[in-house]
Amino acid sequence: MATLPPRKSQTPTRICISKQHLTPLQTLLQMGFPRHRAEKALASTGNRGVQIASDWLLAHVNDGTLDECAPREYIIYACPTGPFLQQLEEFWAKSRQMCGWNGAHNYVPHITLVSFFKAPDECSLQLSKALKQVVDMTGALLDRPLKLEPYMSQNFMGFFVAEEDANYLKRLALQYVKEVSNSIISDTYEQLDAIVACFPWCGAVSSGTRCIPRSSRSISLEPHVKSLHLTLAYQFPQAQFNALKALVETLDASCASNWELRLYSRDPRLATKQVQKVVYPHNPHETDELELRIGDYIYLNTEVVDSSSDGWAEGISWLTGSTGHLPVNYTERTAESDAWTLHRVVQLSKSVASSLTSAEDLDIVDGRSISTEPDDRQNTAHPDIIEGSSFEESEQSVEKYLRQTLKPCLELPSVQLLNSHNLTHQHNPNTPTIEITTNMSSSSTSMSKQPVDEILVEPPAAQPPRPDDTLSVHSDHSLHPGSLDASHAKNRKIYIMRHGERVDFTFGTWIPYCFDEFGNYMRKDLNMPKTLPRRKNSPEGWQNDSPLTNVGVYQANLIGQALLEAQVQIDHVYCSPSYRCIQTCTSALEGLKLTGKQKIKLEPGLFEWMAWYPSGVPDWLTKNELTEAKFDVDLDYEPVQPASELTARLKESTEQFYERNHDVILQLLEQTTGNILVVAHATTLDTCSRQLTGGVPRSTNELRQVIHKIPYCSLATVEQVDGVWKLVEPECLPVTHSKNPRFEWNALSAT
């Protein structure tokens, strides 16, 4: 038998083995990506592998800065974990809710060890390695809580690190700067001019075994080691000092025993921007608009957000790098650090309660922790984020992310009606017959497999039914005047209601399709009104004075019925002159069975912000036109602010808008007694109640944020208790429903 001759050429096995040892950068280069793009992608994704980097490059295909030489900015934090972090997160949430946004909310709780510095993209891997090496070289880990000393002044609140512990952290910072200076500057001395520009603090510390060029010796090396502190609040109004001080005093720093070092980086464009989180998706209608996706972040100029009169601003997408205009109220402000990339986490404590449990729990793009609930964090050590790994578990990470996202939906309360036997023989008239039990510990799998007849239903403790308890099929809703609490019956109330669903927001551009050349209205959908009243300026007049959809009319009627069941008494009715508001008010009064008993008083001063109407006051229907259309308006009512006054307010500021609505509500209260129903716009719920309850006018951005949380037919109740007005829970439940897009019948025959 012939001897098998050896092969001189490289075999497939050797080729396969060699490819397995390629670095992510080499793989990206083999895929055809230019070096500078590949390095930028790896740095932007924290060196988490080829798949994530290539996805980033594809997402940024329309990023105009993709080929720019713009080094990322890096920073090193010492971050608390465990019980102390939970305290701080609760403080962050409460301080923001009670006192509004301040500078501390822009970042995760931290102690800054090395301030922002710039580094070229090819150095990101070395920066990450250096952090681990520094801790390994130091050796000693914290075995007790850091000593933190509270400090409070009129413009700053926080904890300062005691000298002994501060020295330990300073040594880490100094050693890191030294390590980076040696490894990066010396190893890339031929590119020193570029490095010097990126590292303005490097050069003072050098190694005797390395050759650092003379031109670098004048560079100052200064890590952030002066007065190490953890900021709790700053840049806050002095009026909030006492409230913040009370919150700070509840913090217990004695449990600050778990800490970790984190290396973050950010897009250099982020340095002067405000970060907004997308909360509602948006598909562009114009070429200059930016697509909004849930999970994306938008970089905006603070000045543009505050000065925009139409609610639109130009922003940059964190996800794609694209620039375009977007509706600001589809986003909400969030911490700037949410849009940073996390490169490395290294433990500083012997007892570990990490906030980042494992590589799988990190967002696969920027490294933020997916789980933000304190109970979801495991008190176990997480492995280091390995630079240059292939990150083959990305699919599992996505699956885990989806499980985390869907968890609230999968753990909805289990609702079960008692069986007919129980309804017939065991029903207690004072006990609601639906039991809602929340099983937060069970998984979606176990819930889906559990037979319905095996759900244990335990009757709740007997209690009088609430008048608005619509979940209870046997609640007593008979109208007994004596059933209301006597003290609450005497208190004066204002019911402020937003109009229902409107045609223009539901169908978009509708006028050209619903009116013929003679101006005759033609219904195009069952959710559109059958007819429209006559108006002198038709159809143009409907452009800024949209009618309700039929769903909107029904929404308003439901609210009226619920108020009737709750035995709400209405003594006066005021309404914005917008047709959609008049329709809403009429339908609500029908539900309240007050048609013909309460006339609608039209008050132009209740109209929404005039900055949204630069072309002037809308051409509303006249009182005669409304009367002809069978609307029961008060023809004799003289408004507090006539429509002519609005013409002079076309450029009113947000504060002036609040003052206008507040002035109207004060005068209405002075002129009347009893309860008042106000039907107007989304803004009205806030502008007519905020100052009345002791608040101050919101900024433009804050107003946009709050109105997006006020859906159609929302109802706010303000009650006067001992001479003080305050927001209270409405007597009726809200109305909630899903979107129902248009059905195209021929879609069934499409091939």
UniProtKB/Swiss-Prot annotation:
Main location: cytoplasm
Matching Pfam families: His_Phos_1 (PF00300), SH3_9 (PF14604), UBA_7 (PF22562)
Gene Ontology BP terms: ecdysteroid metabolic process
Keyword Nucleus on entry: yes
InterPro entries (alphabetical): His_Pase_superF_clade-1, His_PPase_superfam, Phosphatase_SH3-domain, SH3-like_dom_sf, SH3_domain, UBA, UBA-like_sf
UniProt entry keywords in alphabetical sequence: Cytoplasm, Hydrolase, Nucleus, Protein phosphatase, SH3 domain
Subcellular location: Cytoplasm, Cytosol; Nucleus
Domain SH3 as annotated: residue spans: 271-336
Record field: compositional bias (Basic and acidic residues): 466-479
GO molecular function, one term: phosphoprotein phosphatase activity
Region (Phosphatase-like): 490-751
Reaction(s) catalysed (UniProt annotation): ecdysone 22-phosphate + H2O = ecdysone + phosphate; 20-hydroxyecdysone 22-phosphate + H2O = 20-hydroxyecdysone + phosphate; 2-deoxyecdysone 22-phosphate + H2O = 2-deoxyecdysone + phosphate
Residues of the UBA domain: 16-60
One CC-aspect GO term: nucleus
Region (Disordered) residue spans: 367-394, 458-484
Effect of pH on activity: Active at pH 4 and 7.4 with ecdysone 22-phosphate (E22P), 3-epi-ecdysone 22-phosphate (E22P) or 3-epi-ecdysone 2-phosphate (E2P) as substrate.
Active site (catalytic residues): R498, H499, H681
EC number(s) from the headed UniProt entry: 3.1.3.-
Function: Steroid phosphatase that dephosphorylates ecdysteroids such as ecdysone 22-phosphate (E22P), 3-epi-ecdysone 22-phosphate (E22P) and 3-epi-ecdysone 2-phosphate (E2P). Likely catalyzes the conversion of inactive phosphorylated ecdysteroids into their active forms. Shows high activity towards ecdysone 22-phosphate (E22P), but is also significantly active against 3-epi-ecdysone 22-phosphate (E22P) and 3-epi-ecdysone 2-phosphate (E2P). Also displays acid phosphatase activity towards 4-nitrophenyl phosphate (pNNP) in vitro. Has no activity towards 3-epi-ecdysone 3-phosphate (E3P).
Protein name from the UniProt record: Ecdysteroid-phosphate phosphatase
Naturally occurring in which organism (per UniProt): Drosophila melanogaster (Fruit fly)
Gene name, Swiss-Prot/TrEMBL: Epp
